[in-house]
Amino acid sequence: MEKKVEYIKENDKIVLMCNYGFRDMTLNLLKCFEKLSIDKSRYILYCMDDKAYQFFAEFKGIECQRFSRDDIINSSTSSTQLFHDNNTNDNKGIYSENAESYGDIGFRAICNEKPLVVLDVLKKGYNVLWTDTDIVWKRDPFIHFYQDINQENQFTNDDDIDLYVQQDDDDICAGFYFIRSNQRTIKFIQDSINFLNPCIDDQIAMRLFLKSQGINIKSKNILLSLSENDKKDKIRYRLLDKKLFPNGTNYFNLKITQRDNITPFIIHNNCIIGHRSKKDRFIEYGLWYINDDEIDINSNINNDDENNKEIKLFKNVLKNHTDIITSINSSDDGKLFTTSIDKSIKIWKFENTSGNDTDNGIFKVLKSKYIHKRGGIWSTFIFSSNNNNNNDYGFENLLTSSHDKTIQYWDNNLQVIQTFIGHTGIINQLIVIPNSSYFFTCSDDNTIRQFDLNNINFKRVFIGHNGWVSSIAINKNLNTLYSCSNDGTIRFWDINSGRCLNIIKGNQGGWIRKIIYNDNLNQLISGGNDGTIKIWSCDNLNNFNDNQYLLKINTNENSSINDLQFDSDTNLIYCAFENGSLKSFKLTSNNNNNNNNNNNNNNNTINYSLDKVYQGHLNSSINCIHISKSLNLLFSGGFDKQIKSWDL
C-alpha cells in the first residue's frame, strides 16, 4: 500500500460531471475511487440533469450536486469578470440527458459547461483535479503530483506547478488535469470560457490560451530561469507522462503502457466515438467494474420505501416555461399542450430519435404563444381535430381560463374567436360537457358559471359556496354538477336549474382542493388539504350525508393534495401533492368488507393499495397532472417550471 498522508490535502477537490446517459461510466469511475479508498469528501459530483441527480442522490445514495448554469453564473464566486458583452453561450436545451457522442453539438455543449464548474470551485479556494468520467483510475494521481514529480525534479514547493495536464495525440487533453487555485489559473479559465462558442469547445480554448499564457516546466532549471513578470503572469504547467496517464490511442492502440509493463495512474477511454464503443472497450480490457443491474432504476429501489412499492423514475423533462406550470392536456394525435403563470401556452411534439415509442426521443416545442397578457393561464380544454391533415397542431379549438378573470375561445391558429367574461375573481378550472356547447368555470369569487360557446348572451350562475371554488366535475347522465371549496364542503347542483341539491362536509382538513367524477362507477373522488382521498357514491343524492363515503385513502403524506386523475382502464388514482410527491393507488373490488380505512357504516365494495411512488419534482410542489392515452404517458407540472413524463 502506498502512503496517503503526504498527498491528501484538504483544499484539493476531485471534480467530475455527468448526465444520465453516462451514469454507468460515472459509476465505473466511482468504483475505482472505492477500490483506491478515496473518501467521498475528496470529490464533488455534478449532475447535469434531473434524471442523473435523482439516480445518484436517491437511488444510489451518493452525495452530488445538481448542476445549474444560472446558479454558478449568479454565485458570488463566479460572477466577477466572467462574461464578455455578448455573454457566454447558453447551452440550455442543446444537450440532453442521453449519452452524447464526440463531434455532436450536444457533446460540445456539455464540454463547454465543464470549465464553469472548474472556475466556480477554483474561486472558492480549492485546487481542482478535473476528471472526465470515461476514465478509470488504477492509482491515486495525487501521489504523482505531490511525490513523484517533486522528487524527480527537485521541486521544493507544492505550488511550483500551476497545472498538470494529460497529453492527447497532438496537444493537451481537457479531460484530465490538476489545476491550482491562484490568480493566474483563474484568469486562464475565465479567458477560455469567454472564447467558447458552439464550434469551439473547452479543449480548443484551453490549448489556445495555454500557448499564450503558459510555460512548460520540463525541469527545475526552467522554473529557476523565470523572470519576475513570468512568475507573476505565466501559468507554470507540466505535461503528464503519456505512459502513466495514457489516452485512448496510447493505451488501447499503441499499448505504450503495456509495453513497459507499467501500471498507469489513469486510463482515458477517449479517441473513440460513441458510448457503446467506450463501454465495449472497457469490457474487453477488463476495466468495467459494474453490472448492468447497478444502473437499472428498478434494481436500485430502497426496500425500506413505503410498502416496498415500485419507485418510478420520470422519462422526459420538458423545459421551456419561465414560471409555474398550471395545466397539461394532450390531443388525440399526441400533441401536448402546457400552460403556465408565464401567460403562455406551448404545443409540444414528440420526436423519435430511434425506435417507435417514447423510450427513444424528446419533446420539442412546436408552437408557443402568449395568449392571456394580463394574467397567468390556469386551465385549458382541447377540442381535438377530426382532420389532422389540415391541422399541424392537433386541435380544432381551444378554451383557456386565466387569472385575468376571462375565458378565451381560440381557433387552431391560436387566434381569439370569443372572450367570455363575468367572473370577478381568479378562474380556477373550466370543464366542458361532452358533445355540447356548454362549459363551466369556477372561481375565487365563490361562484360557478355556465357559458354557451354558441350564445355569448347565455349565462347561469351557481351561488352558494362561502369560499373560493377550487374544482368542479360533471355527471352528464344525471345532469349534475359537483363543486368543492375552501369552505370545506362539496355541493351537488342541478345543471338545468342551477339549484343546489345537497351539501356535504368533506372533513378533509378544511379546504377540499380537487374533485373528479368516475363515470364507470358513478362515484365522486375528492382530495383534501389533509392529504386524504375520499370516494363517494353518487347513486342517491337526496339521502347523502357527511359520513357516507365509500372509502377513505390515507396517502401517508403530510401534505395537501393539489390534483387528482383517475384512469378507468386500470382503476388507478393518481395523486399530486404540495410537497412534490406523486403517487398512484389501485382500487379493487372487495365483497368481504375488510378494506383499508373504509367507513364501516357503509356496505363497502372497494379496497385500495399503494401502487407506485413517482419521484422527480424534488422539494417542489406539483401543481397539475394529466393522463395522455395518445402518448401512453402520465405528465406532471410543478412549481419548478418543469413538465415531466412517466410511463403509465
From Swiss-Prot:
Its cofactor is Mn(2+). Pathway: Protein modification; protein glycosylation. WD repeats lie at residues 320-358, 372-420, 422-461, 464-505, 507-546, 556-595, 617-648. Disruption phenotype: Cells show an accumulation of the non-galactosylated isoform of Skp1 in cells. Disulfide bonds: none annotated. Consists of two domains: an N-terminal catalytic domain and a C-terminal domain, not required for activity, that is predicted to form a beta-propeller-like protein-protein interaction domain. Specifically catalyzes the transfer of a galactosyl residue to the hydroxyproline-linked saccharide on Skp1 protein (fpaA/fpaB). Catalyzes the formation of a Gal-alpha-1,3-Fuc linkage, leading to Gal-Fuc-Gal-GlcNAc-HyPro143-Skp1. This is UDP-galactose:fucoside alpha-3-galactosyltransferase. It comes from Dictyostelium discoideum (Social amoeba). The gene is agtA.
